[in-house]
Amino acid sequence: MKLYRTGLLLLAVLCTIPVFAGQPPRLKVGSSSGIFGPVTNWTYETFAEAKRAGIDAIEISASTLFLNKEMTDDRQIEARCRQLKRDLKRAGIEIWSVHMPFGREIDLSQTDEAVRQRSVELHRRVLRFCKILSPRIVLFHPSWYLGHGERDARIAQLVRSVGELLPDVKKIGARVVIENMLGYELVKDGNYERPLGRTVEEVL
């Protein structure tokens, strides 16, 4: 009887394993928009070539798309976003995610409250444009390089900023993720520690 039950259990487990006829389904291949170079290269022809090379999805660099010094007019940026979405859709490439801006003066973890608030407002402005693009994911950069001994305070500020921006992300139908950073060594040099998110434990 015990052997019979074991056999049924094994059969049940095997029935849950997908059975593929021939080759398993192809996974989607994605890339950063960085492969296309400057925004002037972001054309349907470029995207179509990328699709032929096997690219199915893309992460848009918000810094490249929205923080171009020549593009300060909101209507101009909105028009660019609509054209970008049309060209990518026509080429068969999905806008999977948007990598939000980052830098010392646009740091969501800043302990200088004035800088943090400006950073949050900049992110809000970018998210309004992201609504046109309809990404699945919005990726926040956790921080710039930190001064020594700032990590706990910076983590608290990052959590605060993301909490303030979460409703804006939900409005565009996307999910928030926080970028994991490099740097197995905590200290970069005599002045700085590496950015937040450098270990799994820190992200959790």
Annotate the PLM regions.
Residues 3, 20-136, 152, 163, ...:
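N-terminal pre-domain/capping segments
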Residues 7-18:
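Bacterial N-terminal signal peptides
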Residues 9-11, 66, 186:
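Extended rod-forming repeat segments used as scaffolds/tethers
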Residues 24-25, 57-58, 153-204:
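Acidic/histidine-rich catalytic cores of soluble enzymes
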Residues 73-74, 111-112, 142, 146, ...:
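Short amphipathic alpha-helical patches
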Residues 96-108, 139-147, 174, 183-186:
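Substrate-binding cleft and catalytic face of glycoside hydrolase catalytic domains
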